[in-house]
């Protein structure tokens, strides 16, 4: 059975497994994103979703309403290019813009599949973030146009 559902605290071990399995945008130290960080983002700062196949989390996304950004969107490498990320992305942005009209942003490394994914999804580049990441933004108006495509 396949489903996208709201992430809960019990999903955090599988969320961490997905986060640490990616080939791009890897963490220099897997301990940088703790279970407590995940819990805070899915219970207090925003909301998260998991893409589950037969009880196994193969992707997840988390939106942060406090900083108006996408905190995470990751898919296991063997499930990339199968629509998992797109579905998680769309559910997350639909929810985000139901909560606020504030422009949402994210950062990702240049020259990655993630960069291409966000460009294709309609995100607009608007500078840099952190250590050389590309900063992308999505407005509520742009999202309403992108969704109709």
Please provide the spans of the model-predicted regions.
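A short beta-loop-alpha structural element at the N-terminal edge
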Residues: 2-17
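Conserved GNAT-fold acetyl-CoA-binding loop/helix
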Residues: 16-43
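A short helix-loop-beta-strand connector motif used in the catalytic cores of GNAT acetyltransferases and
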Residues: 39-50, 69
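Conserved beta-strand in the GNAT
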Residues: 50, 56-64, 69-74
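A short, internal acetyl-CoA/4′-phosphopantetheine-binding micro-motif in the GNAT/acyltransferase core
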Residues: 73-81, 108-109
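Conserved acetyl-CoA-binding loop-helix of GNAT-fold acetyltransferases
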Residues: 81-94, 120
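Conserved active-site alpha-helix within GNAT-family acetyltransferase domains
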Residues: 86, 110-127, 132
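Conserved GNAT acetyl-CoA-binding A-motif
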Residues: 96-109
């Amino acid at each position: 059975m396949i489903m996208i559902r709201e992430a809960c605290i019990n999903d955090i071990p599988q969320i961490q497994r997905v986060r640490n399995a990616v080939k791009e945008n890897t963490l220099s130290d897997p301990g940088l994103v703790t279970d407590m960080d995940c819990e805070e983002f899915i219970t207090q700062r925003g909301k998260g979703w998991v893409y589950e196949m037969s009880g196994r989390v193969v992707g997840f996304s988390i939106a942060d309403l406090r900083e108006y950004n996408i905190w995470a969107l990751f898919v296991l490498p063997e499930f990339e290019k199968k629509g998992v990320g797109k579905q998680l992305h769309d559910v997350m942005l639909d929810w985000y813009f139901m909560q606020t009209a504030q422009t949402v942003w994210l950062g990702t490394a240049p020259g990655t599949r993630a960069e291409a994914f966000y460009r294709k999804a309609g995100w607009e580049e608007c500078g840099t973030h952190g250590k050389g990441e590309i900063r992308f933004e999505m407005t509520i108006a742009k999202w309403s146009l992108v969704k109709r495509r």
